[in-house]
Amino acid sequence: WNDPVVIGGLIAAVVLLPLWVLIERHGRAPMLDLTIFENRLFAAATAAAFINGLSRFALLFVFVFYYQGAQGDDPITAGIKLAPMALGMLVSSPLAGIWADRRGSRTLAALGMLVSAIALAAMTTLQANSPYWQSAVWLGLVGIGSGMFNSPNTAAMMGTVPANRRGIAAGARMMLQNTGAVLSIAFVLAIVTSAVPKDVLFKIFSGVASGLSDAQLEPFIHNMRTALWVLAATSLVGAAVSLMRPKS
């Protein structure tokens, strides 16, 4: 964080972001038509999508390092072990879409974020030597919660704009969700790597951590739990935002 490049980038962002908003607001052919955010439902749904990105994407990185560092898996095995999260989304997304079309999307989207928050909180009980099935269950539950959120929330967003502006709406959604993902990875990795010796981090990140002792891994496990609590709290905020958005 003390690197001049990082500091310079943050300063540039603070200066350029308001300028970008001004240009987009008053330009003849804006890249992003900001007037779509005047609709309260769309604004709330995109805010929830941003929070979803903030609370989900870093989780994949955290667990890759957990499997490699704490459990001694090679990178390929660590990646395969993330499959329950994708399977959870695969099952819940279409069912959530059908439910939202019939019963509405607001409550279901909020419930999805709540389910994910519970699973993220449960992940803080994992130890370095926990059996795989425990983390697999919680990853699957996060995936189910994400699927319950994504389909209804996206449908609500797209339903607020006319057909000829849905491309703009989809672009805005992806921009904010990806922004949340980038910020999530930056902040969570800062938490996870805090106070962990560089040689230990190198072994964890490179997938050669099988020789690390429990004492060497303890700072990493502690930081991982802290990061998971942060992600769980962020998901609760997302659930509240989803629940408070207008019905129509």
Model-derived regions: residue spans:
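Hydrophobic membrane-targeting alpha-helices
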Residues: 22-23, 66, 191, 240
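Transmembrane core module of solute transporters
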Residues: 1-20, 27-154, 158, 162-164, ...
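Hydrophobic transmembrane architecture of multi-pass small-molecule transporters
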Residues: 154-160, 172-248
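Intrinsically disordered, low-complexity segments enriched in polar/charged residues with Gly/Pro
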Residues: 21-23, 94-95, 207, 214-216
